[in-house]
Amino acid sequence: MRKRLMLSAAAAVTGVLLLTAAGVAACSVATRDAASTTQETGAAGTEAGLDASADPSASASASTSASPSVVPATNCGRYAFAKASTSTLRAAKKKAFAFYFPPYPISIENKDPGSDYWAKWTTEADRLASGTKQGEEMLDRPLTRAPLSGNWRQKDFETEIRQAIDMGLDGFIWEYHSVSSDARWTQLPAMLAAAKAVDPGFRIMLSPDLQQGANSTQASIVNDVLKVKSEPALYKVDGKIVLAPFYPERVAVSFWDGIRTTLAGSGVQSVLVPIFLSGSPNVRAAAWNNSVYGYSLWGNRWVGGADSVRKGAVEAHANGRKYMAPIAFEDTRIYDGRYWESSNSGALRAMMEKAIAGDADWLALITWNDYTESWVAPSKGRGYAVADTIAYYTSWFKTGKRPSLVRDALYYFHRSHRTDAPYDTSLQQIAMHIANGDGASNKVELLAFLSAPGKLVIKQGGTVSTKDVTAAGMVSFAVAMVPGTTPSFELQRAGKVVQALQSKVPIKAKVTHQDMMYRAGGGTACGGKA
């Protein structure tokens, strides 16, 4: 279960440097003394390349040759694919949402990002000064901005709504209670106003929060819903407000039946789409099926468990109900020492493809912005890499067709150290450990969207790994991490570098605190966001 920490991160750099014809020499033409070269050949087919291991039979040889010169980019655009218009995606029967966690907006107090709460929650100096033994509670933060004038909270929500729309999302799932001493929990009116200002078609799905857990009252939830019942931005199906509570099984299903009955008595019709902490639709159906419009689940976070997304959709449909498939990039929790191995971008891609294969009705990205656990919003540590990958899949999910690629894009995903790297046990007393699921992976991944065949190159110091891709498409190329290096990446065609990408994340041989978060970056050669 998520820990509701009231914390927050430092100056925004998006973790990527895209190199085209200008300013590339330092990275793309340096010689490699006694460089070891591994080679791999493959095609970008209909699968996403979830097994991203390098070919164990590849040959290795010494190389001191310089990288080819870089060809200037001419086919510019934000995405590798021709993204459908917002109106086209919005008209699709299938919907995509992201779970919004109110305590962690873009800014907590509208201060300079170098000295705000987010900075205090993530910098090494503040962490050590606080005397913590585990490490910082936050490893990442939203993309930053200078202090704003006027209604800065609503303006920040407007920014996030635009980001979500760019990713193909239809709305946010807002964890909601209206009475709190913490103002961050009571900003639903500002979010609703932001949706109206940016795009009246963007919707907010209510996730009533059990503030007191099993001791929560029906009256408090009913009153919360009645306060916003007439808001046009609320997500409804057939004119009925959708209620999607997280961890609803803390109370009996009769609790939720009573809420809906009371709301109906006030003229407010509603449907229930519970987001269970555990239990598939088949497990929950006996007690819940007569009360729900659909099912959802908080879900798992590893490649090997991704098929539960497909099975959940199949089970929900067999019970005559909708399914909102849980999708996540990763989950790492400094506060209690747990993480789950997501295999770079592998878990995200696997879950998305299983949701498509299972014909899920809706998607729920878990979460938009809970930076203590799992987040997908554009951020300092990942730039737009996760967001752009999601945009590709939401287009596929909604249109039923894998997007064709009209230009190239390169993205990297890797940690800042191996999972077994030495750390300072005097400052971190609880070792990070995998709670369950797939075992630890220590790879650098290049996720490439290719408009035509080409050669992919990953350079880590003197280690150069290559992969020949024989068809256009999305392909994952992953190789073992090399501590003490900062990876760089290339796409080559006809002996020339079409695109080069430099990671902003050095791979450390040893660390003060363990950091199991996957960093990321990248985009198209021009027109993309870092």
Predicted regions and their residues:
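Compositionally biased, intrinsically disordered low-complexity segments
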Residues: 1, 16-19, 32, 69, ...
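N-terminal export and membrane-targeting signals
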Residues: 1-13
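Positively charged, low-complexity intrinsically disordered regions
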Residues: 3-5, 33, 40, 128
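Leucine-biased recognition of intrinsically disordered, low-complexity hydrophobic segments
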Residues: 5-7, 18-19, 50
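Bacterial N-terminal signal peptides
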Residues: 10-23
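Ser/Thr-rich, Pro/Gly/Ala-heavy low-complexity intrinsically disordered linkers and tails
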Residues: 22-69
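Glycan-processing catalytic domains of CAZymes
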Residues: 67-444, 452-474, 479-530
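Extra-cytoplasmic beta-strand recognition segments
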Residues: 448
